[in-house]
Amino acid sequence: MGVSGDTEGNPGCSGITNGNGTFYSMSSTRFRDIKDGTTNTLVVGERGIPSDWGWGWYLCGGTECEHYISTERGLSRGQNVPSWQGTLRRFWSWHDGGLHFILGDGSVRFFSYNMDFTTYRDMSTINGNEVVSF
């Protein structure tokens, strides 16, 4: 799933239309737009399917279904997700301890579910001028 930034979209299922990350409805993000540096910017993250095979991603209508998620709700451990409600609008996987993200420089990194929440959110934006260290 694409990373839309650090704020959620319309709870009425219209998707994320004004994200500050790489992917959101009608976005046209280019490499030159990633001012925080491609090495420090999350682009695509893992998204597991819940054990009950409920909604793998948020149910929505129209043409703006979420194929991208914000980091506002934090990371969710797949092992602790008892039903589909616990998986909505979160990045997570069934891996022990964390999940994979593709960064703007094309690298793939494994991030712990215990990573600092502020760092996680800072890495989801493309031009927040945050200094990220991990």
Model-based region annotation:
Residues M1-F134:
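Surface-exposed loop/linker segments characteristic of extracytoplasmic
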